[in-house]
Amino acid sequence: MREKDLIKLEFDKVKEVLASYAHSPATKEKIQNLKPYTNKEKVKEEIELSKAFFDIAENVRLFEFEDIRELLKKAKLQGAILGVEDILKILNVINLTKEIRRVLSSHVQRLEPLRKVYKKLYTFSPLENLIIGSIDPRGFVKDEASEELLRVRKSIRAVEEEIKKRLDNLINRPDSAKFLSDRIVTIRNGRYVIPVKTSHVKKIFGIVHGTSSSGYTTYVEPQFVIHLNNKLTELKQKEEEEVRKVLQRITEYIGDYAKELLESFEACVEVDFQQCKYRFSKLVEGSFPDFGEWVELYEARHPVLVLVKEDVVPVGILLKEKKGLILTGPNTGGKTVALKTLGLSVLMFQSAIPVPASPNSKLPLFEKVFTDIGDEQSIEQNLSTFSAHVKNMAEFLPKSDENTLVLIDELGAGTDPIEGSALGIGILEYLKKKKAWVFVTTHHTPIKLYSTNSDYYTPASVLFDRETLKPLYKIAYNTVGESMAFYIAQKYGIPSEVIEIAKRHVGEFGEQYIKAMEKLSDYVKKYEEEFRKLEELRKELQKEKEEVEKLRKEYEEAKRKGWKEAYKEAREYLRKLVQESEEIFKKAKEKKEIKEFVSKKREEIENLAPQKPQKLEVGDLVEFMGKKGKVLEVKGNKALVLVDHLRMWLDTRELQKVGKAEPQKETKVTVQTPVMEKRDTLNLIGKDVETAVRELEKFIEEAYSAGYKVVKVIHGIGSGKLKSAVREALSKNEKVKFFRDAYPKEGGSGVTVVYLEYGEET
């Protein structure tokens, strides 16, 4: 398909909205490169995948992830070393892969299309453990990453302590105030120095490492710590070398897993893409049409208009029995919008993007879509405008065939009306010969009359309210619309004398034509109103049908849960039975105790055994799994029982008759469901470090016990002391999987998002 046709139909704007929901630059790139498929099976496959994902979309929790494709290429190179930030980007994708795999694992059996994505979601436990064991969430390579690194860092700390100790002895001498500008130890050029008054710099033997901007202070490395600073420098270099070795080892692992990581990353992008489509569908209330022999687009709304307006009037666009549609009617009546709605809906459908139209809609597959649409409707159209339209049509007319959709706005405009009409009819005849699908709009009467006698084109018109001079944005089929030039002119104050003169120039035939159009338009409006009422009735029936289906599913689920609970109780009883047996046999001193115990338990077990079918009647009160119910119907060994507002067919051997039900007065009961309070956020602003850390540990313990997987800690920005204390405490907490700065929409750097090791995400 031509790029300019996609742009004319505003397909790029739909993709912009889709991309705004993406969690990764790679997903945005995928959306930007998206084009309609021209293979029917491919469209079906993509739609089935989207439908399957939409079924579980609310369970999927995605987070931001980077494009790691170039990093994986680099990791495969001999001797390559990835930086800490790059490795953490890959770890982030591993974590996302694990989360998506967890959600999909319980649905792939039920939703077959998800299996293709699920198979690409690998597990990376060895690599994940290596990264987590070597690098902390802040991007710091841990001491434990290697034995040599641990030894070197211990040496570094020992040397640093010795240097500080010696310098502290100097700056804390009583006479030091005479030559020091401040009693502190600082670092310049990677070496420990002290700030000396420039005027007294000669009193300290050592190396000068610079002066302050004011010149008042000179930073001096005393001679007695030079050898220690040298040793520290050597150790720092060894530390860097060890860190490089750690990163290189991790990079080699990543290179070994590059193929699987790439496939998992692509699966993450696919899931992100599907979630973008799901959120877009919710925004526009979209659905997927089915494939059909004809164009049947019901209650369609222009997708771009839906995004910027709330009160978009739906329209039905039908090409049934005939492959062509000629739409007429006044300006601002919605002709161009209807034309674009069909075109854009086709592009979206063949891209597997939900269309804002009724799910009952159907569309054929189009291999090509050609457009001739002017973005600006001008009162004065010149030859250059006409030439541009002709040039465009000359390009696509020869390429049109039976699988082509041609959309032409204002056919025949831009030149002499008589010649323009004749040329327009010629184009329509040519496209008919090509068996193309055609949707055109026009004002020209000869083309209107042509459509009424055509076996290929259906005439249609947009409806207009004469009283308010407002379009109704509805299409009436098998009728032609008047341009209403005289009526609109009169309403807006053109003198009646002018209107009468104009009508005389139209001629007797033209006047009869106008009156016929007015009468036909009134009839169509009445027809549309009746059709609207029927459509509302159909919707109500559909809604009731969906409600019945929902209740049926709820009943089946409740019944399934009931059996599951019964099975759970039985297992628990048997577990306790075994436990009691072990305790009795252990403690029993006499054979009598054992006999009594065995006799008692045998009696209990016999009570659990299946009973003979009971003779039950309608109205009997029975007991089932400790709950009372009422018999509504009996068929052989089966009884329909009402238990806790649920109707269930049960085996009569599972029921215990407890009496006859007494007639009860109808009682209305209002049930209020308590709202469970969720505590997934901790605010530490204003707390001192000690109190904050104590509350944080308690909060993490409670959140972990409550089953949360993600929680938030608000610490603010401030001096950064509280945030550092929070991060340090989190890094030591075994229940914390990892943590990160909140995204701007979550609170930014003043909030830390914490992922717990177990539990379920809120």
Curated annotation (Swiss-Prot):
<dbReference type="InterPro" id="IPR036063">
    <property type="entry name" value="Smr_dom_sf"/>
</dbReference>
<dbReference type="GO" id="GO:0043023">
    <property type="term" value="F:ribosomal large subunit binding"/>
</dbReference>
<dbReference type="GO" id="GO:0072344">
    <property type="term" value="P:rescue of stalled ribosome"/>
</dbReference>
<dbReference type="InterPro" id="IPR036187">
    <property type="entry name" value="DNA_mismatch_repair_MutS_sf"/>
</dbReference>
<dbReference type="GO" id="GO:0016887">
    <property type="term" value="F:ATP hydrolysis activity"/>
</dbReference>
<comment type="subunit">
    <text>Homodimer. Binds to stalled ribosomes, contacting rRNA.</text>
</comment>
<dbReference type="InterPro" id="IPR007696">
    <property type="entry name" value="DNA_mismatch_repair_MutS_core"/>
</dbReference>
<comment type="function">
    <text>Acts as a ribosome collision sensor, splitting the ribosome into its 2 subunits. Detects stalled/collided 70S ribosomes which it binds and splits by an ATP-hydrolysis driven conformational change. Acts upstream of the ribosome quality control system (RQC), a ribosome-associated complex that mediates the extraction of incompletely synthesized nascent chains from stalled ribosomes and their subsequent degradation. Probably generates substrates for RQC.</text>
</comment>
<dbReference type="GO" id="GO:0030983">
    <property type="term" value="F:mismatched DNA binding"/>
</dbReference>
<dbReference type="InterPro" id="IPR000432">
    <property type="entry name" value="DNA_mismatch_repair_MutS_C"/>
</dbReference>
<dbReference type="GO" id="GO:0140664">
    <property type="term" value="F:ATP-dependent DNA damage sensor activity"/>
</dbReference>
<dbReference type="GO" id="GO:0019843">
    <property type="term" value="F:rRNA binding"/>
</dbReference>
<keyword id="KW-0547">Nucleotide-binding</keyword>
<dbReference type="Pfam" id="PF01713">
    <property type="entry name" value="Smr"/>
</dbReference>
<keyword id="KW-0699">rRNA-binding</keyword>
<dbReference type="InterPro" id="IPR045076">
    <property type="entry name" value="MutS"/>
</dbReference>
<dbReference type="InterPro" id="IPR002625">
    <property type="entry name" value="Smr_dom"/>
</dbReference>
<feature type="binding site">
    <location>
        <begin position="329"/>
        <end position="336"/>
    </location>
    <ligand>
        <name>ATP</name>
    </ligand>
</feature>
<keyword id="KW-0540">Nuclease</keyword>
<dbReference type="InterPro" id="IPR005747">
    <property type="entry name" value="MutS2"/>
</dbReference>
<comment type="similarity">
    <text>Belongs to the DNA mismatch repair MutS family. MutS2 subfamily.</text>
</comment>
<dbReference type="GO" id="GO:0006298">
    <property type="term" value="P:mismatch repair"/>
</dbReference>
<keyword id="KW-0255">Endonuclease</keyword>
<keyword id="KW-0378">Hydrolase</keyword>
<feature type="domain" description="Smr">
    <location>
        <begin position="682"/>
        <end position="757"/>
    </location>
</feature>
<keyword id="KW-0694">RNA-binding</keyword>
<dbReference type="GO" id="GO:0005524">
    <property type="term" value="F:ATP binding"/>
</dbReference>
<keyword id="KW-0067">ATP-binding</keyword>
<dbReference type="InterPro" id="IPR027417">
    <property type="entry name" value="P-loop_NTPase"/>
</dbReference>
<dbReference type="Pfam" id="PF00488">
    <property type="entry name" value="MutS_V"/>
</dbReference>
<dbReference type="GO" id="GO:0004519">
    <property type="term" value="F:endonuclease activity"/>
</dbReference>
<comment type="function">
    <text>Endonuclease that is involved in the suppression of homologous recombination and thus may have a key role in the control of bacterial genetic diversity.</text>
</comment>
<dbReference type="GO" id="GO:0045910">
    <property type="term" value="P:negative regulation of DNA recombination"/>
</dbReference>
<protein>
    <recommendedName>
        <fullName>Endonuclease MutS2</fullName>
        <ecNumber>3.1.-.-</ecNumber>
        <ecNumber>3.6.4.-</ecNumber>
    </recommendedName>
</protein>
<dbReference type="GO" id="GO:0003690">
    <property type="term" value="F:double-stranded DNA binding"/>
</dbReference>
<keyword id="KW-0238">DNA-binding</keyword>
